Amino acid sequence: MGNTSFILASIGVFLVVILLLVIILLVAKKYLSPSGNVNIEINGDKTINVPQGSSLMTTLNENGIFLPSACGGKASCGQCKVQVLEGGGEILDSEKPHFTRKQIKDHWRLGCQCKVKGDLKIKVPESVMGVKEWECEVISNNNVSSFIKEFKVALPPGEHMDFVPGSYAQIKIPAYDCIDYDKDFDKDLIGEEYIGAWKKFNIFSLKAHNPEPTVRAYSMANYPDEGDIITLTVRIATTPFLPRPQVGFQNVPTGIASSYIFSLKPGDKVMMSGPYGDFHPNFTSGKEMIWIGGGAGMAPLRAQIMHMTKTLHTTDRELHFFYGARALGEAFFLEDFWELEKEFPNFHFHLSLDRKDPVADAQGVKYYEGFAVNCIRDTYLKNHEAPEDCEYYLCGPPMLIKTVTDYLDSLGVDQESIMYDNFG
């Protein structure tokens, strides 16, 4: 009996202590957490009254001002830059790698890291003020190579996006419990031509999980004259393979955004905002233009090239496009560029494939055997009279960007003449 009373008394004391701790936490939250509304003055001519507590990027997003963010607010892409002229506190260590000392002195911050805790005066690029968000409808979502989708969405009726070729859009990725590659991916949309690779590498065994909403950025492959159907090229980000000779996948999460997009079907709805970015052609310089790309980096380069030719009918500038792929079956939109070569004598398309390709040989497709940077060097620039006088537009995997920029630097090409859209 005595032991029972002691146990009950102990439980009672424990519950009282827990209750007191909860009360203390609630009181502390009330007095220490930001509460009430504050004012944010934007570009000196607009003020919004907003609740405290969220990041500046989230707060602006909720008020129709969409800062670019390719990483979903993780401080890794460094794109959500904004000047915080008053308020905001000290810059965080997570932000400093994205800015020069002069930019830090000029009060530049990352919107995803700056918390709204009081009145602010900020300055955002005027281009951001023109960004809109829409609920779009998926029109098609078909593979154009083994692991890349041509993802097309339609803007709502009557809506239009004004953009410069080379811009990108952002897709909202909702939280989801599980996307099962085998059950949730439409195998007909992957296509008979490519599904063998998925089975070979056991990719349908993968699953994806996303505990919280985020956003991802994708360059647009369409050019303005193609209307209000937005085309993105999206590569599936699978879990990395184990090092050989091991078989299987590493214990690393799959790509939450690409998994979501690959699961979408015609008729589905998706939230998209845009346009973003400054990877745009120089329309007036008169210089020779050279585009270099690989993989899903095709998207903004196609948009720029099609606009320069089909829309602007540029015939007074030399135009060259170098595109690299592992094999002919992994290259896409090729017909567009073969047709341009016929229509525009000043446009030249150079396809490079990593190794000898029997399929390309059987079809009589002209290609360079080797990597894109070697193709540029061996077939064109090594005999070019003045490579430093050309403009270069690059988009593709980081290794491609690095090897090409290193090579161009060795030729004496100024950094100002090299524009690129780098992605991982």
Walk through the language-model features, giving the residues of each.
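Reductase modules of NAD(P)H-dependent flavoproteins
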Residues: G2-G73, V84-K105, K310, T315-G424
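Fe-S ferredoxin-like electron-transfer domains
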Residues: L20-V27, P97-E159, I179
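Residue-level marker of beta-strand positions
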Residues: S55, Q79, Y168, P266-K269
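Cysteine-centered iron-sulfur cluster-binding motifs in ferredoxin-type domains/subunits
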Residues: P68-G78, G111-K115
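Ferredoxin-reductase
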Residues: I139-P266, S352-K356
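A short, basic/flexible loop-to-alpha-helix module at the beginning of a structural domain
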Residues: Y260, S273-K287
